[in-house]
UniProtKB/Swiss-Prot annotation:
Catalytic activity: L-tryptophan + O2 = N-formyl-L-kynurenine
Entry note: cofactor: Binds 1 heme group per subunit.
Assembly information from the UniProt record: Homotetramer.
Cofactor: heme
Protein's name in the database: Tryptophan 2,3-dioxygenase
Length: 265
């Protein structure tokens, strides 16, 4: 005879995806119809950020091993996810300023500025700024993850390591890095010129890095325009500067050398 308890414990679609917990994680703080959409969209963003960080960690491992083909496949996946993240802005923009204002006060100090996963992503892209740690308690997981990401090699550091495995003489990156985003380096650009002139797999990997940088910048632009059309120049929730801060993040490349070298190709 079949054991009934064994049947009840069998893996199902719902249990594998933890759907009971997942679908119970939306807890609106008002009776406003549109608040659920706001929560769902932002939770989906966090899931995508988790996947992007997961993929970029894998990407760095492949680059360190000199596996250009696997790196290209992983970058393609990340770029496709970023397109999905950007397209999601269309959904949140179906909410009018009046609809958002109806429940905005219920957010209290909660703000997207506090997204630890996005700060980890920024650190992986190369941002080195202790101000990113300010919103998080020092003994909390968010603080630890961001600090660890800032202490680890950035994606561009990993790209340089990959280029070294392909026979290119890459300059040593000084540690600790200056605060902020990576600054252009003529020594790095000379190496990149060699890479592009060789026109091999390494050049393709560099081009996908340009796509990654562009994809993140596209997300930033769509995000700031969404905030502007929803709350204008009002301060963000939690006392953040809102659209004004977001505008300050536009057009700052994560990989400036890959952009600077293009004029010499």
């Amino acid at each position: 005879m079949t054991d009934p308890s064994a049947h009840s414990a069998a893996l199902t679609y719902g249990s594998y995806l933890a759907l009971d917990e997942l679908l119970a994680a939306q807890r609106p703080r008002s009776e406003e119809h549109d608040e659920l959409l706001f929560i769902v969209v932002h939770q989906v963003y966090e899931l995508w950020f988790k996947q992007v960080v997961h993929e970029l960690t894998w990407l760095q491992e492949r680059l360190h091993r000199g596996e250009g083909g696997h790196a290209l496949a992983t970058l393609k996946r990340v770029l496709t996810i970023l397109k999905t993240v950007v397209a999601q802005v269309d959904v949140i923009e179906t909410m009018t300023p009046r609809q958002f204002t109806a429940f905005r006060s219920r957010l209290e100090a909660a703000s997207g500025f506090q997204s630890a996963q996005f700060r980890v992503l920024e650190a992986m892209l190369g941002r080195r700024d202790d101000r990113m740690l300010a919103p998080y308690p020092p003994d909390g997981p968010g603080y630890a993850r961001i600090a660890a990401a800032m202490a680890a090699p950035s994606l561009f550091d990993s790209l340089l390591r990959y280029l070294a495995t392909q026979g290119f003489e890459t300059p040593v990156v000084p540690e600790p890095r200056p605060a902020g985003w990576r600054q252009p380096s003529e020594a790095v650009q000379r190496v990149l010129l060699e890479v592009y002139r060789a026109d091999g797999e390494a050049a393709l990997v560099c081009e996908r890095f340009v796509d990654l940088d562009e994809g993140v910048q596209e997300w930033r632009y769509r995000h700031v325009k969404m905030v502007e059309r929803t709350i204008g120049d009002k301060p963000g929730t939690g006392g953040s500067a809102g659209a004004r801060y977001l505008r300050s993040t536009l057009f700052t490349p994560a990989f400036p050398d890959l952009w600077a070298v293009r004029g010499a190709l």
